[in-house]
């Protein structure tokens, strides 16, 4: 009732999402200790939890932090698939190359304040984005 899914259905859906993301082929149950998972598998579980309710906006704060190249690519592939499903992803990161590759729009913050916004078609390289960031933040 009231939109809640039964526990078995929740576990089934969580496992489907985790496998879809590609972080693990292990089946996870309600009693599975997260501590037994690798960093990438934990990240997969966290992302699966974030998309579980089919939210229109998914916030990923440093989702590739401490991941291998293979796991990072899985995050990128997943984000691209989410974007194709008409959901938005707020991708927060410090790696300018990751941010540039995955984003359509950029919002530059300085001390929590929005100081500049631009679309990907306004720039051609991550280095150009970095220069705009330096110039914008340096002006404040």
Could you tell me what each predicted segment is?
Residues 1-140:
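Glycine-rich phosphate-binding loops of nucleotide-dependent enzymes
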